[in-house]
């Protein structure tokens, strides 16, 4: 195989070249943050997200996140660097680049140092790493059959599936915390958690080996008092705590050391502007368990510690993990950096949610202090959302007929006991069973929320109900 003799070929591929002719890590081709640097303008924000479909009101940043054009360009440069000379990329650039990304993550989330951070594809992968370890603890006799894993009723489905696929099969008893919704205060969550923990411990006859706590539940979205729940776990002798923070980084302040969980994992492609897919898992380096965690994809790095095992799982595209420093540069172009973005997103989503609730005669599913950049808003009861199928059907109608993309939630559970009556029925006295989960990110504008407002108002004015979406046989079962 011929080697590059000069920088010409590398430059043609959009990468730089070392003096020996080998391609070097790509340099950014955009403004950098710095002292005295001008904040990003509205026009520049629009340009960064010009690849979004402008015909759609995009109110669902939570599921897939977003990535600005400048970061996508940086990713493409890494991809071209690999394609231009894969051997040099592997031997000289991949691991230093991933180390820079781990250091950037560690600084952003308050980790002790970069050795406590492992980069993975997503929180689903992080959960598999943890559940694999817990399953081995059962298989090797460290845990006894019947010992408990505690999780929320609203724990995300893939995490629940991981718990059952690994841990329940190994002999664990799974106990769910039945969180209320809508909810009017964090105290209701704390009370339910304490009650479920008491059930799990069964008067001290069972050991709770792992508690899985969401930082922000996905659906319905609720900001959980995670630090308080971790402290309760410590008081009650829970062995290990895993915080599923899939939506946290970029939505709420995160200090993993202050939170104090044994395992903390968050996606970076949801609210931190990374391309899909990249996440991290944090474990304290002084915790002996950290050396026992292994990536489920076993490679030549097996046994070299989770950060290194995760840094090489075979030939694949690592570019999403390599651009974290570029993302840090991007967020620092905004006034206040990521914290400024977070505060403005929170204020805007509350403002837009309040506007929608007032227009529809409904209410917010949580108080403002229990949300980040996503918020649940009740739909008019006359829409008759009576099942998860109804919620999916109505969401599809909003997408196809009104060009509004927003997740819907069917609430079949009771509200918190202390929830006021105005968080149960709408202004017409109809029970509220359907909710939209709106989000706000830097690219959103008021007109998108007004499109959702007007679409729902039109459906109500036209006398639409979800009965019209149901096939006849389904209608009979719900009658």
Swiss-Prot record:
What name does this protein carry?
Answer: Putative L-cysteine desulfhydrase 2
MF terms (GO), sorted A to Z: L-cysteine desulfhydrase activity
Q: Lyase among the record's keywords?
A: yes
Q: What is its EC number?
A: 4.4.1.28
**Amino acid composition bias (Low complexity), ranges on this chain:** 7-36
Residue span of region Disordered: 1-36
Give the protein family: Belongs to the class-V pyridoxal-phosphate-dependent aminotransferase family.
Q: Tell me the function of this protein.
A: Catalyzes the production of hydrogen sulfide (H2S) from cysteine.
Pfam families this protein is in? Answer: Aminotran_5 (PF00266)
Reactions catalysed: L-cysteine + H2O = hydrogen sulfide + pyruvate + NH4(+) + H(+)
Keyword list, A-Z? Lyase, Pyridoxal phosphate
Q: Where is the signal peptide?
A: none
What cofactor does this one take? pyridoxal 5'-phosphate
Q: Which residues carry this modification: N6-(pyridoxal phosphate)lysine?
A: 270
Is the keyword Cell wall biogenesis/degradation in the record?
Answer: no
């Amino acid at each position: 195989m011929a080697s590059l003799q000069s920088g010409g070929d590398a430059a043609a591929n959009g990468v730089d070249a070392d003096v020996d002719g080998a391609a070097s890590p790509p340099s950014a081709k955009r403004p950098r943050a710095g002292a005295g640097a001008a904040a990003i303008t509205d026009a520049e924000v629009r340009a960064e997200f010009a690849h979004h479909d402008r015909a759609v009101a995009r109110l669902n940043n939570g599921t897939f996140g977003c990535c600005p054009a400048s970061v996508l360009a940086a990713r493409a440069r890494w991809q071209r660097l690999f394609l231009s000379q894969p051997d040099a990329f592997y031997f000289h650039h991949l691991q230093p680049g991933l180390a820079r990304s781990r250091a950037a993550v560690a600084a952003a989330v308050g980790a002790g140092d970069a050795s406590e951070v492992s980069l993975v594809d997503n929180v689903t992968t992080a959960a598999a790493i943890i559940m694999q370890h817990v399953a081995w603890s059962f298989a090797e006799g460290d845990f006894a059959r019947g010992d408990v894993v505690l999780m929320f009723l609203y724990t995300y489905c893939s995490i629940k599936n991981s718990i059952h696929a690994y841990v329940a099969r190994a002999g664990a008893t799974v106990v769910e915390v039945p969180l209320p919704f809508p909810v009017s205060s964090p105290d209701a969550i704390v009370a339910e958690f304490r009650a479920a923990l008491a059930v799990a411990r069964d008067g001290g006859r069972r050991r709770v080996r792992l508690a899985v706590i969401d930082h922000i539940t996905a659906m319905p979205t609720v900001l959980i008092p995670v630090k308080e729940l971790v402290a309760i776990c410590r008081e009650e002798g829970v062995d290990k705590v895993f915080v599923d923070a899939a939506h946290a980084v970029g939505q709420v302040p995160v200090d993993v050391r202050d939170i104090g969980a044994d395992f903390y994992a968050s996606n970076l492609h949801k609210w931190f502007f990374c391309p899909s897919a990249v996440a991290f898992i944090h474990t304290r380096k002084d915790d002996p368990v950290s050396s026992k965690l292994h990536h489920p994809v076993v490679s030549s790095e097996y046994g070299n510690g989770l950060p290194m095992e995760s840094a090489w799982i075979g030939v694949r595209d690592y570019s999403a993990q390599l651009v974290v420093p570029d993302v840090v540069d991007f967020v620092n172009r905004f006034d206040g950096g990521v914290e400024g973005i977070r505060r403005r997103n929170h204020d805007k989503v509350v403002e837009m949610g309040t506007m929608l609730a007032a227009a529809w005669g409904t209410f917010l599913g949580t108080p403002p202090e229990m949300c980040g950049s996503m918020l649940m808003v009740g739909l008019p009861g006359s829409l008759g959302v009576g099942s998860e199928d109804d919620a999916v059907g109505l969401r599809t109608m909003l997408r196809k007929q009104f060009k509004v993309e927003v997740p819907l939630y069917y609430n079949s559970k009771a509200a918190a006991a202390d929830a006021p009556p105005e968080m149960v029925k709408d202004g017409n006295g109809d029970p509220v069973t359907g909710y939209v989960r709106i989000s706000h990110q830097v690219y959103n504008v008021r007109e998108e929320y007004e499109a959702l407002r007007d679409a729902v108002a039109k459906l109500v004015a036209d006398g639409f109900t979800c009965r019209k979406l149901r096939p006849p046989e389904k209608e009979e079962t719900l009658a």
